[in-house]
Amino acid sequence: MAKKSPLQKFLIVTSTFLGLFAIAVLIASPLAKYFLEKYDQYLFGREVTIERAYVNIFTGYVSLHNVKMSEAKSDTIFLSSVSIHANINRYKLFWREVEISRLTFEKPWVKFTQNKREFNIDDLIERFTPNKSPNSSSSWNVEFIGIKIAEGELHFIDKVIPIKYFIKEVTIEALGKLDEGDTIATRFNFLSGIGTGEMKGYFTVNTKSLDYHYDVVVEDYDLDIIRQYIWELINYGMFRAHLNANVKVRGNFNSQESMSGSGRLALNDFHFGKTTTNDYAAFEKLELVVEELNPAKKKYLFDSIVLTRPFFKYEIYDSLDNIARLFGKRGSNITDVTRQVGRFNLVIEVVRYVKVLSNNFFRSNFKINRLEIKDGNFKFNDYSLSDKFSIEGLPISLVADSVNKSDQRVKVVIRAGIQPYGKGSIQLSINPKDSADFDMDYRFEKIPVSIFNPYLLTYTSFPLDRGTIELNGKWNVREGMIQSSNHVVIIDPRVSKRAKNKDMMWLPMPLIMALVREQGNVIDYEIPITGNLNNPKFHWRDAVFDLLKNIFVKPPTTPYRLEVRKLESEIEESLTLKWEMRQSTLDKGQVKFLKKIDAFLKSNSNAVMTVNPVTYAEKEKEQILFFETKKKYFMLTQPQASKLLSLQDSMKVEKMSVKDSSLVRLLSKNISDTVMFSIQEKCVNFVGSKIVAERLDQLIKKRSVLFISYFKEDGTDKQIKMHESANDIPYNGFSHFKLGYEEGIPEAVRDAYHQLNDLNKRSIRKKYKKYRNAGPLVAN
């Protein structure tokens, strides 16, 4: 065999090496794919599938396509990615170290799952956490330098609460070495997966000291995740809100108070309540502009805090109220969660954190350049009475300029309109260094006493159909000790007919009114309050002396008071025709009055009377609803009763309580909605709203026909202009016909006006003239 030349040997060795190298290059990629899939359990503790792999053995570049990783001990997908690529330091592999740089996930889909304290990534964290034990020589250390997620979608599931939430178009780029002692800098940007919104920013954290810093911009971010956490705390209800923010914060994870932040934060379109259309609390916008917030240094410096169009509704039912219905009696739903050690609820944690941040607010250096509440609305409904009581503060405003601890006093002005009638104002002068040191002036005026008829009916059986409430006072509080004067005036209160129903208690209101009412037909009392803010003392001496004075001094003025009352009644009856609830017939006095009007029109052929029916539809509907409910129940429980109730049966139904235990059980048994708490809702469910609307229409038409019938005999009905019925809340609390005279006023009415004006000039009534101007003599 011929001896090979050195050149031949070189060529053979080189070609062999190149051939083996070429084979290695060619098989490296499929070999890597095979190796990762074959030893996936050893490497990751999970099953991994890869559609295609590319490995560059010269540069250490690795690219994997269509990667899927399952959950531990499951075939459920945990992660999938269109592409995963990175650079691996080849030389460190010889020292059992895997250094991965520029690890990039293209369009990944990841599902994070929490079950109590366990997460579905716990095994991965444990596997890839570097082993710092000096005795460890067998394990591999894995180190990451820079990680990027591009256009990802991250899902989070809490199996206990439960929570299902995700974010999309996620871009996260972590720069630097992910190892102890290094600062990790991260840029992020993502969209809300549910609803609208974007969040982007920059975040750094020192993994050794746990110092952090972040700049975050949030644009119209849907807080649906809050809704899901709230559902764990409530029995029913809906929530929605959007967040806008631009904030910069520094701090340390070891101390909640060691943070310093500034920027702008706004909650928009906040709604929380029974349903998506029935709010208990809401506001259009809450905006905070923070100059510096640093609890550790006791700095709370705000440029402005502005709450726009807040709404709050508080309701009392026969059992509990709307707050207790939401969160359980005494907040039992919340305590059930907070008592569980290690239980996480985002809402509770946020509240706890805010409490920590604001704990020392009044003992700190605080400043609010502008504090304002605009166009507020507070509504109170009481369904526990025989009739529904409702009152509303709208609009409510609060303005406080320059709330600064360095100032001696801070002035706060609160103004409120009271619906359906009235207004109020409160002026406060507060020592910013001591909240128990303040002065207060308040005034509430033009409030019709008929608003409170549901309470009067429930506890006395007597409503009031006339009267205006005025309330004012001054408080001076120093170190928590009160010195105050409180003045209440009720102008021209008048007791109406007694209502008879088993829901109502009875008190002799006409007698009580005779005792408490003073000579000028007013109730006028001063009630000083002293003592401590935590234990105020009411002084009734003035009220008692006035009561005795009314008993012994008022009788000589009785003729005068009777004359005034007669004239007021004559004027009122000439200008209005009052209808009791569900009344469709006229009493003797009303018939007599209509005959007088008929005679006046007959003798004054040019006179024209206008009639404007005003229907208190809300109350009329409520009373019709109660009657129809009791009637249907009576028919069901009295098989012998005919479909047309007799007069005796009607009286039984009328006096029956709509809150009779047997009736309530029947109503509750047939409810179609588990969040029907008021007797009114249950009655509507029982009889339907259609029949109530029909009965009201029939009642309105019947009243108009009945009224006109008294003028047809003499042909004076042609001198009457009957307008369409208007739905309103009357000042006197009753439906009525408002009467007007186009061609002259009846002489008797004119004379009565003149006489009443003369009587009002007397000293007994003159001092209350300004109050009488606050409320109409007759209903609007």
Q: Whereabouts are the PLM-identified features?
A:
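Extended terminal
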Residues: 2-14, 293-298, 303, 359-366, ...
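Terminal hydrophobic membrane-targeting helix
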Residues: 21-116, 144, 172, 177-179, ...
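Buried hydrophobic packing residues in well-ordered domains
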Residues: 40, 64, 84, 103, ...
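Amphipathic hydrophobic-ligand
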Residues: 45-47, 74-88, 100, 161-173, ...
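Secondary-structure transition motifs
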Residues: 66-174, 274-395, 492-510, 533-547
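Solvent-exposed beta-strand/coil patches in large extracellular/periplasmic or lumenal scaffold regions
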Residues: 126-160, 182-191, 198, 252, ...
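Outer-membrane beta-barrel pore domains and translocons
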Residues: 204, 217-219, 266-268, 308, ...
